[in-house]
Amino acid sequence: MTIIKDIFEQSRDINRTIEKVITYGASQEHRLKSEISEYVVTESIEQQFNDLLLKMQTAMESGGENEVGVWVSGFYGSGKSSFTKYLGLAFDESITIDGVPFINHLKDRFHKQTTKSLLTTVAKRFPASVVLLDLASEMLAGATMADVS
């Protein structure tokens, strides 16, 4: 008789911790390794990465390197935080997991060679400083520190 546990990938502990919420501040190497290894890039997510990277490349090549800003929106739980966190970390050469640049771990999650190549090209040709800002958490932090009279 097959049990549910047998359906899952045998190389991973079914009782492992999987983060429910991806936060920008959690950047310890072991945590990033766990997060990125669990990250499932669907066809739609990969298309969004590809579209954004193409737009970034076009903007940079047309002289708009000082004008690139990105607003990511979506429903609760749709993957906005993981999408932006992993893209941002891919542009930071100092972020590594087991000595391997984070960008390589993200590329391993993609299925299409074109997306992998585009990420490599944009990251190398246009070095960037990435500021990850979670407006909701900033707003909540401000609300908890407000004076009450």
PLM regions: where:
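P-loop NTPase motor core
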Residues: 40-44, 70-75, 82-149
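Walker A/P-loop-proximal flanking segment of P-loop NTPase domains
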Residues: 1-78, 85-91, 108, 130-133
